A protein has these predicted regions:
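Aromatic side chains
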Residues: 12-13, 29-32, 40, 80, ...
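C-terminal cap of thioredoxin/glutaredoxin-like
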Residues: 31, 118-169
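A broad, low-specificity signal for short, low-complexity segments enriched in glycine/proline
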Residues: 19-21, 75-76, 119-126
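A structure-centric signal for secondary-structure junctions around beta-strands
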Residues: 23, 76, 156-159
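Extracytoplasmic thiol/disulfide redox context detector
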Residues: 1-68, 144, 148-152
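Short hydrophobic/aromatic-rich motifs at helix boundaries and adjacent loops
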Residues: 15-19, 50-52, 84-88, 115-119, ...
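Short, flexible active-site loop motifs that bind/organize anionic cofactors or intermediates
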Residues: 27, 103, 117
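Structural alpha/beta surface segment adjacent to cysteine/selenocysteine redox centers
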Residues: 38-114
Length: 169
């Protein structure tokens, strides 16, 4: 493949595992509190739209940045996932990024997060039903497990980090 020939190991990517995933996928580890992630978001959205059919961009929000308590960061993860479930993931990500990076505002409580989404046309009943639901908490825990796995083996050292097929960084 001519395009693949342009990428050089050690220059454009690093091999981080011996085996790749059984199904193609791209994972982006990011934080709403990360300025680099804020600036990378348009690139990530374009990447998601240009991936081959059936290859998802899985956005994994991390909770290890010192800018906010892990509980606040996990609440933002849930808010983003609600947006994604409502087919408004990019919109919700943009709202949260702008609130933090353009407005310089801080989330003091779950209600602050809820209010931001509700004033921007996210349905209150759906938000309330999903925010603390067991499936939501399980999904957040799965993200945390991936964060821990890749952090402990030295792959996830900062954000944004993009992994392709669980093998290439």
């Amino acid at each position: 493949d001519a395009k693949a020939d342009k990428f050089v190991e050690g220059t454009h990517y690093t091999v981080v595992a011996t085996e790749k995933t059984s199904q193609p996928k791209v994972q982006e580890f990011f934080s709403f509190y990360c300025g680099h992630c804020f600036h990378f978001e348009p690139v990530a959205q374009k990447l998601a739209k240009n991936l081959p059919a059936g290859v998802p961009l899985e956005k994994i929000h991390v909770d290890f940045l010192p800018a906010a308590a892990p509980e606040v960061q996990q609440a933002l993860t849930r808010a983003y996932l609600i947006g994604k479930e409502l087919d408004q993931g990019d919109k919700v990500a943009g709202l949260i990024f702008n609130y933090i990076h353009r407005q310089g505002a801080k989330f003091g409580s779950d209600d602050d997060i809820r209010n931001l989404l509700l004033v921007n046309d996210i349905d209150a009943a759906q938000f309330d039903a999903k925010f603390n639901s067991l499936p939501m908490l399980n999904t957040v825990q799965q993200m945390k497990t991936l964060q821990t796995k890749w952090s402990e083996n030295g792959v996830l050292t900062g954000v944004p980090t993009v992994l392709v097929n669980g093998k290439y960084k």
